[in-house]
């Protein structure tokens, strides 16, 4: 599980920062990539990475402002030209379906793969045997969501050496033991599968704030997460601007991370007014409150290790 920041700017593209998009690379877990937001020219940014558009399985949109969605039509269309055949699902607020379908219709774009579009509400928006994705409403003046990606605990590996020492040869019985079932062997012995499994590996979690003012719902969503990706459009001295425009400051993001007991904070969605050394100062403002903070930049990659 890795994060790759494709765009870390706010509002409009800048020379050093494209508008918002973050890739969650799940290549080991499910051989796919999930995107969170898809600002203008996200597909251009992808060209500078190892991401293959056909591997993009899901796109989660936090809200319908242009700097978070204008890259969708181009990316969806290009995916067809780049070998995309597997279904892609887009999740987002009301309006996302009309935006995508209208864009594809008026440009007469034909997709070579199934496209599903889900307009979401608060709650669980996706779940399978590996992951659960939860959305909560955040405060941005329009309908907007934050997302938590929670990996489910991974069952412990089978203690095959112990089984062999007990003269239990490999075979279908190993699958039952691996599921934790109680098994009766051919010689009459009864064993509990859980006794032959290593401890389960705790699932990892990543939270994406989207654009928001300080939000109690977001803080709860981020409780004990491994990584909190939080917008920091403004420096702490610009607190009033942040409030007026429904955004957060570096300091506010850091306080949220601290109160949520997140393990790591990554700042993104940084205004173009902060260039060069000024953007380094943003990171320092967060570190002063929450030491394990970093200000993202375009193409930053962050591994999400198991605890």
Curated annotation (Swiss-Prot):
Organism the protein comes from: Bacillus subtilis (strain 168)
Chain's role: Zinc phosphodiesterase, which displays some tRNA 3'-processing endonuclease activity. Probably involved in tRNA maturation, by removing a 3'-trailer from precursor tRNA.
Superkingdom of this protein's organism: Bacteria
Protein name according to UniProt: Ribonuclease Z
Residues reported in the UniProt entry to bind Zn(2+) 1: 63, 65, 140, 211
Cofactor remark: Binds 2 Zn(2+) ions.
GO molecular function: 3'-tRNA processing endoribonuclease activity; identical protein binding; zinc ion binding
The reaction(s) this protein catalyses: Endonucleolytic cleavage of RNA, removing extra 3' nucleotides from tRNA precursor, generating 3' termini of tRNAs. A 3'-hydroxy group is left at the tRNA terminus and a 5'-phosphoryl group is left at the trailer molecule
Subunit field text: Homodimer.
EC numbers: 3.1.26.11
Catalytic residues (positions): 67 (proton acceptor)
Entry-linked NCBIfam families: PRK00055.1-3, RNase_Z
Enzyme class: hydrolase
Cofactor(s) recorded in Swiss-Prot or TrEMBL: Zn(2+)
Family membership: Belongs to the RNase Z family.
Residues bound to Zn(2+) 2: 67-68, 211, 269
UniProt keyword list: Endonuclease, Hydrolase, Metal-binding, Nuclease, tRNA processing, Zinc
């Amino acid at each position: 599980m890795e994060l790759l920041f494709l765009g870390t700017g706010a509002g409009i593209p800048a020379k050093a920062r494209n508008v918002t998009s973050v890739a969650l690379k799940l290549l080991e877990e499910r051989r796919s990539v999930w995107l969170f937001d898809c600002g203008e020219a996200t597909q251009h940014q992808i060209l500078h990475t190892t991401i293959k558009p056909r591997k993009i399985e899901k796109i989660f949109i936090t809200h319908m402002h242009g700097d978070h969605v204008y890259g969708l039509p181009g990316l969806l269309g290009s995916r067809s030209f780049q070998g995309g055949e597997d279904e892609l699902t887009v999740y987002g607020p009301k309006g996302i379906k009309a935006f995508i379908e209208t864009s594809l219709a008026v440009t007469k774009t034909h997709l070579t793969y199934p496209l599903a579009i889900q307009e979401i509400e608060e709650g669980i928006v996706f779940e399978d045997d590996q992951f659960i994705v939860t959305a909560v409403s955040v405060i941005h003046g329009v309908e907007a969501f934050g997302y938590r990606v929670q990996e489910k605990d991974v069952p412990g590996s089978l203690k095959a050496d112990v089984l062999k020492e007990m003269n239990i040869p490999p075979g279908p019985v190993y699958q039952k033991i691996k599921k934790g079932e109680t098994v009766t062997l051919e010689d009459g012995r009864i064993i509990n599968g859980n006794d032959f499994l290593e401890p389960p590996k705790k699932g990892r979690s990543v939270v994406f704030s989207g654009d928001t003012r300080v939000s109690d719902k977001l803080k709860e969503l981020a409780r004990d997460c491994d990584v909190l990706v939080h917008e920091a459009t403004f420096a702490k001295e610009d607190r009033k601007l942040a409030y007026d425009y429904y955004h957060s400051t570096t300091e506010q993001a850091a306080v949220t991370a601290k109160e949520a007991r997140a393990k790591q904070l990554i700042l993104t969605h940084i205004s173009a007014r902060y260039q060069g050394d000024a953007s380094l100062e943003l990171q320092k403002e967060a570190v002063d409150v929450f030491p394990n903070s970093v200000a993202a930049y375009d193409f930053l990659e962050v591994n999400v290790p198991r605890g």
